[in-house]
């Protein structure tokens, strides 16, 4: 069905809009049912261009799907090795990132031939490899999260976050840690009390520069990114992503989950500025080139640390503003009592590991998890663009889409942008940002060709799926595709992406000219 987003509603948001692509859903495959293995899920996926297949990583291993038809081809069981977290493919080789049964032990990377689907080699890497990718020259990289292990009755076992680089031609593994940053301050957030970067920082996701010289790694809980020199195989910098000022116009947010009228009725539209700061805390990261330079796109999901250990005690950095244990500084917040009301900021989930600027035990700033946005960073990790509150505000501005917003997450991290991938479509570069917390699967499409002025294109909405976890976009046979792994429904979906030769239009200009009928077209499954 072809439908139009009301231009007047979009124009009111002063959001640039460009129509550069159309989309159509081709198929959805349900894992764990029929020909698939019982209990299998869909979390991360990779495309094999040699065989036109999608390899989908889930709880039980990898399901291989025929990309042309969406039919099941084969299952590779990885449960004997540990927990499968990620899959990547390059030139007929698939790499699996697998956490050890005890997650603080060394993890492993397994490689397979994508044509014969036979096992090739195994490599030991750092603790809890959460993401795997290939470099331009064929090396394999893993982001090893190194989460601590907390179990009732046992002392907490610490692990070290790291990045591993595998040279398969030499069967060598180089693992990089953060001990060189233990004497530094201000580069990345420290969550656990008294911890050092070498223990506290947890690499999450990797993207590669377009010249193949560098990698950028998200350190989600630390609210930072690390830059890796792939030639010297060294960490060359760690850059804090700073804080998002939600008191500024364009950064409005919904702070309460108490304005729903029924389970599927969305927010009442109470987006507003508030005296809080968001920690961007990106999960996924992707890269692209513009003007001869590399830029990185981050999905600013947010994350917190919560450990339950009956020997060492419990650590949970989450608290609501309205909690009596969360004391606001009376000078910074003379209206603290009003702010703590549930109708104001009282329901908002914040961190206890930041905001006490003078160390006196009360909070001079309110820090929330995630940016509820995507950002574009330059080659050194400096922000050149942030989508502000567009991802949620654009959904709400469309009467046909606002019911997809789960108001029960407003007090947490909103729609939680988690996954991101990019696609070069002619002379344009499109970014696809997947939301984890909407009732149906929602993916925002932005034209990011100009990295300092990204423009909204469309929403992809899939009523058969929800909780988009992984995305990959690719070209095959002269056509363009987007594949999504939908964790909530255990499904994988494939969409065709089609260029639309339409000149750029800006919402502010539309409002000024009164062209309220002009809108971004979209198809909805």
Label the predicted regions.
Residues 15-18:
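N-terminal signal peptide c-region/cleavage motif recognized by signal peptidases
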Residues 5-13, 510-511:
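Sec-dependent N-terminal signal peptides
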Residues 522-525:
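Short, charged juxtamembrane terminal tails flanking transmembrane helices
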Residues 5-8, 20, 519:
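Compositionally biased, intrinsically disordered low-complexity segments
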């Amino acid at each position: 069905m072809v439908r139009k987003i009301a231009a007047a509603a979009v124009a009111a948001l002063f959001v640039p809009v460009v129509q550069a692509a159309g989309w159509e859903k081709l198929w959805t495959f349900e894992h764990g049912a029929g020909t698939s293995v019982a209990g299998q899920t869909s979390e991360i996926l990779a495309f094999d261009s040699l065989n036109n297949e999608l390899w989908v990583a889930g709880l039980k291993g990898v399901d291989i799907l025929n990309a042309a038809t969406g039919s099941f081809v084969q299952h590779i069981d990885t449960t004997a090795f540990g927990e499968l977290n990620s899959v990547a493919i390059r030139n007929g080789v698939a790499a699996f990132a697998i956490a050890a049964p005890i997650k603080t032990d060394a993890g492993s990377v397994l490689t397979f031939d994508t044509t014969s689907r036979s096992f090739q080699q195994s490599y030991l890497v750092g603790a809890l490899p959460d993401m795997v990718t290939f470099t331009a020259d064929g090396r394999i990289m893993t982001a090893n999260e190194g989460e601590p292990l907390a179990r009732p009755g046992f002392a907490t076992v610490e692990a070290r976050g790291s990045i591993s680089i595998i040279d398969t031609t030499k069967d060598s593994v180089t693992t990089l840690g953060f001990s060189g940053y233990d004497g530094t301050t201000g580069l990345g957030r420290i969550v656990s009390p008294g911890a050092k970067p070498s223990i506290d920082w947890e690499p999450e996701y990797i993207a590669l520069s377009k010249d193949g010289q560098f990698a950028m790694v998200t350190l989600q809980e630390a609210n930072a990114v690390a830059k890796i020199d792939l030639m010297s195989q060294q960490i060359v910098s760690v850059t804090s992503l700073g804080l998002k000022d939600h008191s500024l116009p364009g950064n409005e947010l919904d702070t309460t989950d108490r304005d729903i009228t029924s389970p599927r009725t969305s927010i009442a539209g109470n987006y507003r500025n508030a005296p809080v700061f968001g920690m961007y805390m990106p999960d996924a990261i992707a890269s692209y080139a513009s003007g001869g330079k590399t830029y990185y796109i981050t999905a600013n999901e947010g994350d917190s640390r919560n450990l339950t250990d009956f020997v060492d005690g419990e650590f949970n950095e989450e608290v609501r503003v309205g909690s009596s244990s969360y004391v606001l500084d009376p000078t910074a917040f003379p209206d603290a009592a009003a702010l703590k009301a549930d109708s104001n900021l009282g329901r908002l989930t914040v961190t206890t590991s930041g905001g006490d600027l003078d160390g006196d035990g009360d909070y001079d700033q309110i820090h929330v998890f995630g940016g509820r946005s995507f950002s574009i960073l330059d080659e050194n990790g400096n922000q050149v663009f942030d989508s502000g509150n567009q991802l949620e505000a654009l959904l709400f501005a469309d009467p046909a889409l606002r019911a997809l917003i789960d108001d029960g997450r407003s007090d947490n991290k909103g729609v939680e942008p988690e996954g991101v991938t990019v696609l070069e479509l002619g002379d344009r570069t499109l970014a696809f940002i997947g939301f984890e917390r909407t009732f149906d699967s929602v993916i925002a499409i932005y034209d990011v060709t100009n990295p300092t002025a990204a423009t909204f294109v469309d929403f992809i909405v899939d009523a058969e799926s929800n909780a988009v976890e992984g995305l990959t976009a690719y070209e095959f046979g002269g056509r363009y595709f987007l594949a999504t792994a939908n964790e909530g429904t255990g499904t994988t979906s494939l969409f065709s992406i089609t260029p639309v030769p339409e000149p750029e239009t800006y919402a502010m200009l539309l409002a000024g000219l009164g062209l309220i009928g002009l809108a971004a077209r979209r198809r909805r499954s």
